[in-house]
Each structure stands twice: as C-alpha cells, then as structure tokens.
C-alpha cells in the first residue's frame, strides 16, 4: 500500500546502535530444512484475480535497492524471541537470491520505467545494508484520542504519527551517516502495544492501525525528504496473531513470520512504485494490493507451518504478486528465461591489447535481446560481442554480462579475468 502524502518533520532525537551487515557473508541460521519448489508448484497455473492490469504512470522504479531495518523498541517494550532474527534473515535471503527467478521478486522484472524515451526494466537486485536497534522513548501520542480510547485501542500504550516515524528515520540516517536517495529503503518495525496513524487527519474508520483490530491497513510505504534527497521508508506495526493482518502460517515458528509477509508486500510495491508515480491500476492498487492474502500453492511445511517460498534455503509464507504478463497473482516468474554464456580471447589477455568477448544467448521463442557488459576497470559495453582494451593490468577482476529479453527476464553471467 502506497501513501502519497507528506508530513511535517519534528525535532530530531538520537538514534540507537547500528549493526552493519554484509548480506553475502552471513551464514544461514540454524533451523528447519526446506525443500525446493516442486515442478507442480513452480509451474502451476496462475490464479486469476479480479481487476485490471497495473499501468505505468511515468515515474521511476527501483533498478536496485539497499535495505535497512530499524527496530524501534524502547526499554519498557520488547519483541518476542526470534522476531527480529526472522526479519533480518528474510532481508538477508532476499538480497542473497538477487537476479534469480525462483521467488516472487523475480516477478518484478517485467515492469520498467522510461527515461528520455528509453525503457529500462527492473533488475531483481537487493542489498541488505544493516539493522538499527533504536531504544529512545516514544514521543507523546500525537494521534486522535479515539485511537487509544477505543475498546480495541485500550491495549495500546502509545500511538505514533507518520511525522514521528519520519523523524525517527531522519534521526537514524543523520546519526549514522547513512545513504539517502530513493535507492535506499528504511523499514521501521514497532513492538506490541504500539498504534500508528499514517494520515494527518484520520477518521474512526480509516487512517490508523491499532494492535487488535488492525483495521485501515497492515503497513504502508512512502517517502520523505532529508538533506534535499528523497528516501523511501516503510512502517510495519507488530502483527498480533489474533488480528486480521496475520498471515495464518508460521514456518519459522515465531511471530516474525507474519510481518515478513507484510514486508514482502511493501518491498515489492516500493520496487515498482517508489514515489507513487510508478505502477498501479485504475483503482490505485499496486502489485501487492491486488493479491493481498492470496498465497497460492504451498511447497511443503515445517512442524510449525506451511511455506510457499524458499529463498536462500529458508522457507517463508508470502502472498503472491500481480503479474501483468500472466494476468494473475503469481508466486514466481514461470515464463521462459534467457540462458547465456560467454568466452573471451585471448584467454590470457595482456593490457594494452584488444580482448574479444563472445556471448551465446538462447530462449525459446525469442531472438531479440539487450546486452550490458561491465568490466573490472569500469568499462561498459551494450553489444552482443564487444572488444575491450585494458589500459592497466588487472589481478582477478570480474566481468559481468546481463542479458535481457523484451519481457524484462534476465540472465546474468559472471566470470573472473586476469590481465597481465
């Protein structure tokens, strides 16, 4: 769910400790063993849902993104055991499996933006940059009284406004000199007993989240401005297992399973509609909204719950994502994908002399592809078989080839090269 509004910033507060994570280096945590998607599950007929396709509205999409998790938990509050680790494992796994088509993030690659008349498809390219545990007290409630005075709201001890959430994100960014720009997304998680209002003037039936009814919304994504730059942020209140936001399954055996489903909903929407000017349908529904609580086929189950996605070897129960190409909600991209390889000659290149790169690409029914080569000296090429001259020696550099078909499906090939 996107939120197309701005809010007034308030005074800043200090941020908590930042734990920087190199996603590719994190070992998988101990836990259940998960099977891979079966052929039947992978190639099952997509389930159609009502409504029109999402359409492009002229704004940017995310071709790559860096993700940060902020857990705002003052000393008098707490999260259940395993909640934070399940969330961080999810972000780590999504980053690890970048460029694959085996999970729902591969569905996003059919969408694109247009700059100066050039269409550029999304690449499933995510980096998990770190976790911030913020422990400063919550501010006094700025929400309408009925949120805390209602029967359901009596379980709430505080209600955070969107302006207060924005202030916290700015504080964390400033306190740790973190990056800005729409390629950076900050997910804010709050503990049990914390309500939230995303609109400046909510009504009793719309605009607020409370820990029991969880009505109005389960989470939202939006953007703010700090230091003259836009930043994406997502608000994810704690999901009670008795509330309507609960996903219904817990394959990892803790309450973090449900909020991970909600995070995936918002993350996919942020990729395709970061500023509210990207992809959504005639009713304003984004690719996650159109498939809310539509989960599709399970792959298998652990002793504590079913899972329908295996990402970096871990199982998750995640809602499906809308695919224009399939005209349905789907769990993963099941259409034909390009396969690619390349070689270079001479096999022992010398700097100052020409190196020829030759690629081979195939995909059933497709003959037109786009190519993007990146070389370890910073060079780039966009033809099928480029030549490149390395001005200096290179010790174990990386050459990357990304091949895209007309539908946004991609093949990625990486090879090392040493230039003497």
Q: Predicted regions span which residues?
A:
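Metalloprotease/metallohydrolase-associated module, dominated by Zn2+-dependent proteases
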Residues: 210-257, 273-338
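Structural recognition of the beta-strand scaffold that forms the well-ordered cores
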Residues: 66-71, 100-101, 106, 113, ...
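Bacterial N-terminal signal peptides
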Residues: 17-28
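Extracellular/lumenal mature domains of secreted and surface-exposed proteins
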Residues: 324-420
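C-terminal region of N-terminal signal peptides and the immediate post-cleavage residues
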Residues: 26-43
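Bacterial N-terminal signal peptides that target proteins for export
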Residues: 4-18
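N-terminal carbohydrate-binding/catalytic regions of secreted carbohydrate-active enzymes
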Residues: 38-149, 159
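Active-site-proximal segments of metallohydrolase catalytic domains
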Residues: 118-223
């Amino acid at each position: 769910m996107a939120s197309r509004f701005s809010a007034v910033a308030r005074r800043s507060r200090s941020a908590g400790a930042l734990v920087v994570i190199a996603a590719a280096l994190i070992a998988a945590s101990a836990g259940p063993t998960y099977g891979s998607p079966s052929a039947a599950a992978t190639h099952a007929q997509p389930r159609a849902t009502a409504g029109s396709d999402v359409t492009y509205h002229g704004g940017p999409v995310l071709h790559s993104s860096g993700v940060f998790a902020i857990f705002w938990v003052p000393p008098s509050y707490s999260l259940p055991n395993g909640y934070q680790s399940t969330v961080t494992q999810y972000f780590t796994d999504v980053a690890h499996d970048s460029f694959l088509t085996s999970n729902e993030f591969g569905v996003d690659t059919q969408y694109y933006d247009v700059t100066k008349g050039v269409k550029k498809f999304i690449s499933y390219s995510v980096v998990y940059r770190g976790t911030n545990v913020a422990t400063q007290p919550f501010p006094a409630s700025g929400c309408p009284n009925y949120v805390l005075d209602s029967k359901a709201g009596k379980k709430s001890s505080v209600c955070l406004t969107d302006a207060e959430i924005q202030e916290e994100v700015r504080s964390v960014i400033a306190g740790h000199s973190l990056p800005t720009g729409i390629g950076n997304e900050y997910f804010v998680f709050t503990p049990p007993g914390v309500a939230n209002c995303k609109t400046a003037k909510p009504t009793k039936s719309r605009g607020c989240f409370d820990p029991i009814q969880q009505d109005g919304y389960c989470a939202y994504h939006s953007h703010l401005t700090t230091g003259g730059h836009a930043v994406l942020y997502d608000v994810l209140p704690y999901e009670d297992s008795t509330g309507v936001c609960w996903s219904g399954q817990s394959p990892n055996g803790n309450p973090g399973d449900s909020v991970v489903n909600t995070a995936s909903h918002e993350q996919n929407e942020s990729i395709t509609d970061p500023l509210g000017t990207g992809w959504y349908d005639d009713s304003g529904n984004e690719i996650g909204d159109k498939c809310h609580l539509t989960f599709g086929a399970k792959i298998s189950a652990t002793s504590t719950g079913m899972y329908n996605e295996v990402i970096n070897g871990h199982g998750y129960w995640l809602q499906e994502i809308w695919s224009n190409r399939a005209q349905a909600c789907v769990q993963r991209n099941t259409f034909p994908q390009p396969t690619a390889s390349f070689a270079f000659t001479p096999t022992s290149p010398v700097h100052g002399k020409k190196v020829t790169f030759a690629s081979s690409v195939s995909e059933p029914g497709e003959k037109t592809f786009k190519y993007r080569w990146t070389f370890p000296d910073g060079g780039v090429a966009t033809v099928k078989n480029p030549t490149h001259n390395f001005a200096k020696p290179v010790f174990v550099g990386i050459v990357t080839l990304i091949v895209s078909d007309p539908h946004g499906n991609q093949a990625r090939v990486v090879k090392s090269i040493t230039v003497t």
